Amino acid sequence: MELEFLGTGAGQPSKQRNVTSIALRLLDERNEVWLFDVGEATQHQLLKSNTRSRKVTKIFITHMHGDHIFGLPGFLTSRNFQGSELIDGGKPTDVTIYGPAGLQQYVFSVLRAAQVRLQYRINFIQVRPGIIFEDQQFAVSAFPMNHGIEDYAYRVVEKDTVGQLQVEKLLKLGLKSGPLFGKIKAGEIVKLENGLTINGKDFLGPDRPGRIIAIVLDTKDTPEIIKAAEQADVLVHEATYGAENSIMAKRHGHSTSLQAAEHARAAHAHQLILTHISARYLGKMADQLVKQAKNVFRPTYIAHDLEIFDIPAKKSERKDKIDVG
């Protein structure tokens, strides 16, 4: 699992930072990539990256401001020309797009006006607060933000992986590998031929706890941020302004780097990555954003375009239960 920052700027592109897009690379977990926002020129950024458009299966849009969506029609079109990952004997993979009201109309209007005919299907899911996607491996929840427009943060929860089957313990009971092992690994209660009844859970190692990623972009302070980021392994948080511009940040519906750190600390997050940086913060000025945050929350980093952060799998069992909602 990796986070690649395709664009880390705020409002408009600069020479140092393109506008917002984040790729959650789940190549080892499910051979997929999920995008969070698709700012203008995201497809150009992908050309500089090892992330392939054909791997993108889900796109999560936080809100309908241009610096977060103007790259979406172009990305969908270039994905069409570059070819999709083929499944089921040649059928291109579909893309599911999650976002606020008006997103589907926007995308289809642009594609229709440009006479684009996609070789794959786009499925639109209008976001509401709560769980918006869930399967046996992951759950994604949306939390309403405070930005003067319909806006969401996203919480990605990887579900715990069942512990490994302790084969040696079973062999000591005289059992041989076969279908019975499958039932035991599923945690079922099994009656053996010798009359002994065993609980499959007693023959499993500890579960491997899943990872939690929180994506909190354009917003000013709201209690929903803490809910979205609760015990996140990585909290990605906008930091458009420094603490010295807190009044301006509030006026424009944004956060400061100091506020991002306060949110990370309150949510008991493990790591904070700052993004959505205003073009006014260059060089040492950008370093000041990190310094302000580190005074409150030490494990803070600032993202740069095309930078990749690895999120390693956990080895120890998490003692507390994490709510995916």
Curated annotation (Swiss-Prot):
Entry function: Zinc phosphodiesterase, which displays some tRNA 3'-processing endonuclease activity. Probably involved in tRNA maturation, by removing a 3'-trailer from precursor tRNA.
EC number: 3.1.26.11
Name by which UniProt lists this protein: Ribonuclease Z
Binding site for Zn(2+) 1: H63, H65, H147, D218
GO molecular function: 3'-tRNA processing endoribonuclease activity; zinc ion binding
Enzyme class: hydrolase
Gene3D superfamilies referenced in this protein's UniProt entry, alphabetically: Ribonuclease Z/Hydroxyacylglutathione hydrolase-like (3.60.15.10)
Pfam (any one): Lactamase_B
Record has Hydrolase as a keyword: yes
Free-text comment on the cofactor: Binds 2 Zn(2+) ions.
Binding site for Zn(2+) 2: D67, H68, D218, H276
Active site per the UniProt annotation: D67 (proton acceptor)
Metal-binding is among the record's keywords: yes
Keywords assigned by UniProt, alphabetized: Endonuclease, Hydrolase, Metal-binding, Nuclease, tRNA processing, Zinc
InterPro entries associated with the record: Metallo-B-lactamas, RibonucZ/Hydroxyglut_hydro, RNase_Z/BN
Similarity annotation: Belongs to the RNase Z family.
Catalysed reaction, written as an equation: Endonucleolytic cleavage of RNA, removing extra 3' nucleotides from tRNA precursor, generating 3' termini of tRNAs. A 3'-hydroxy group is left at the tRNA terminus and a 5'-phosphoryl group is left at the trailer molecule
Quaternary state and interactors: Homodimer.
Cofactors, names only: Zn(2+)
